[in-house]
Amino acid sequence: MKALHFGAGNIGRGFIGKLLADAGAQLTFADVNQPLLDALNKRKSYQVNVVGEQARVEEVKNVSAVNSGSPEVVALIAEADIVTTAVGPQILARIAATVAQGLITRHQQGNTRPLNIIACENMVRGTSQLKQHVFAALSEDEQRWVEQHVGFVDSAVDRIVPPSEAGSTDILAVTVETFSEWIVDGTQFKGQPPEIVGMELTDNLMAFVERKLFTLNTGHAITAYLGQLAGHQTIRDAILDPAVRQTVKGAMEESGAVLIKRYAFDPQKHAAYINKILSRFENPYLHDDVERVGRQPLRKLSAGDRLIKPLLGTLEYQLPHDSLVTGIAAAMSYRSEQDPQAQELVTLLAQLGPKAALAQISDLPADSEVVEQAVSVYNAMQQKLAH
């Protein structure tokens, strides 16, 4: 199996790339970070530190790398059996032209073996969005051929992979938690789905996408935002603070009530899933900074993301949402010198005031009860900070 993976960052190396390599794939990473590419090509392997109750070091072997702007990438797409990505939602649109070029070359070469493309991003149906961008760069004739021979497979991914420790001398080493989940839409493959240990097939992907978004992502973000307000440095410090934990768990239970209603999840199993996630946030071996996890607050406060989407579900089913609203107010309070979206958030709050700013960012009606509620909690948070 020939595999091409876009994004040789920590998630690419520590999660998706690792599973592909473990499945015996001939794996090539595509990235723009030249020192990283050089190191991968020189060593052909790297180490993954899996940390948790039982820490272990696993070696990933037989890998190579190419620059994602190079002609080699196009040639690799023409030959590959599977193409995956972990580049971040913003970059996905940027690699579409390259993917399209690779598919055109594949067609020209008469390669009709099935190819499956799987975007492994923190977004809902990311591969379907990638497909739209790719199709925008294809003629109608090419589109017809691609529809026949190429599967665009949506997925949900979950593994906490913090940035490398400062002072780590090995550019390729990566640290990951023990837990990992990669769930793919089994209905979207062309040909037989590849056998990859750790990749699970489902015919109800949206249930898993929302379960992860409404629990892991919602909980992680609110832990970061409340943690920063309380002066904590890491996610672990924040979740061990009883006041933070109570709101985070409350928010996950509120979003969980939406999932239970929407997808008929078993309430006891879902409660166990929430507790599992809380214990992952407590992992003492993952030094995950609240400022990093809170980054891009405008995206995280948008209508389809981890804070507003579950809130909309609670409104749809007339369910409680106080903890989610507190999380939204905490997201409005996020500050970071390093993050452009945090700066933009501050500007919007100053120019429009909290009510109009939240309405603009989230698409919630400015005069709605939840916006009023969020603004009142936000104002109380700001007053507390001022004292």
Swiss-Prot record:
Binding-site residues, NAD(+): 3-14
Keywords: NAD, Oxidoreductase
Catalyzed reaction equations: D-mannitol 1-phosphate + NAD(+) = beta-D-fructose 6-phosphate + NADH + H(+)
Cited PROSITE patterns: MANNITOL_DHGENASE (PS00974)
Gene3D superfamilies cross-referenced by the UniProt entry: N-(1-d-carboxylethyl)-l-norvaline Dehydrogenase, domain 2, NAD(P)-binding Rossmann-like Domain
Example of a GO cellular component annotation carried by this entry: cytosol
GO biological processes: mannitol catabolic process
EC number: 1.1.1.17
InterPro entries: 6-PGluconate_DH-like_C_sf, 6PGD_dom2, Mannitol_1_phos_5_DH, Mannitol_DH, Mannitol_DH_C, Mannitol_DH_CS, Mannitol_DH_N, NAD(P)-bd_dom_sf
GO molecular function, one term: mannitol-1-phosphate 5-dehydrogenase activity
Broad enzyme group: oxidoreductase
Family the entry assigns: Belongs to the mannitol dehydrogenase family.
NCBIfam families per record: PRK02318.1-2 (NF002646), PRK02318.1-3 (NF002647), PRK02318.2-2 (NF002650), PRK02318.2-5 (NF002652)
Protein name: Mannitol-1-phosphate 5-dehydrogenase
Species in which this protein is naturally found: Yersinia pseudotuberculosis serotype IB (strain PB1/+)
Gene assigned in the entry: mtlD
